[in-house]
Amino acid sequence: MNIAVLADSQNHSKEAETIREALKKGDHTVEIYDVDQQIMATLKAKRPDLCCIAAGTEGDTGVLQEMLELLQIPFLGSGSESCRISADEKISMFSLLRYVEAAEEELAVEPLVSFKFSAKLIASELDTIVQVCEERIPGGYPYEVRSLAPEKTATTTVQDSKEFKDALKACEKTGCLVRQWVEGIRVSVAVLGTGWDAHVLPPIDETENAPVSLAALSSSDEVAQAIRSEIERCAFEVCLALGLRDFALVRLVWDGAQVRMAEVEALPSFAEGSAFEVACKTAGLSIEGVLNHLVEL
């Protein structure tokens, strides 16, 4: 099978090479294409049998998926609409609420309160943003601040108004997301497959980058197992509600009483040491095995 891996200059070496090497072991012909170099015309001419989009590329927001749908070229991962929804936390939660209402069930996961601010608003209303966030975000400081730049950036945790202002100023050209921070165990849950046939892999503790310890969840094995099952159920329901396909990574927080949803990655990193790769390894799977299985479906 002729497979095209779509990547940009920033993730070409790591993400794209990981995917190419994995698929080549399945005896596929794999070529990496730069999405910044007339990618639509190139794909229209080459007509690969399948495309795979490297994490961190424009596929995070569904742009590349929509182009592939237009060209009628199959691709791994979720469709453009699901990617757009999962990239926006507020729309994700709205979709999840609609799903729960339609299924006549109770909401299994509680969202973290978050707000997005444009670069223009930060530049002109910085003090007001700080005041309103202090009034509206439950629990007060700390907050999480993340740039809205196209490339993925680290999240900054701010402890007071001064640090908050500094973090906002650093995002004056990009805009930012400000999110409630809660004490708890932060986990990344990898999900493989589509719909009701999807499988949830062991939750990964983000602090340790290792399988979450039952002892960290509760001193009682029975209670800890129940909490882990609830975390896995929440991840499964999020993917089902958002219509995610093939693979996803759901970031959750167990705050000691309930599961809170932080964000969803429809296009997770497959690189060695990533949460998705660690989850696969924990479950006895390999990235090459997972990708080649999905390609053959």
Q: Positions of the model-derived regions?
A:
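Active-site nucleotide/adenylate-binding loops and adjacent lid/helix of ATP-dependent enzymes
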Residues: 1-7, 30, 84-184, 229-232
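Residue-level detector of structured alpha->beta connecting loops
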Residues: 47, 72, 172-175, 243
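Helix N-cap/coil-helix junction residues
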Residues: 73, 102, 107, 244-245, ...
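ATP-binding N-terminal substructure of ATP-dependent carboxylate-amine bond-forming enzymes
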Residues: 1-95, 117-127
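ATP-dependent carboxylate activation and anion-phosphoryl transfer catalytic cores
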Residues: 222-297
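Phosphate-binding site of ATP-dependent enzymes
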Residues: 160-230, 254, 259-260
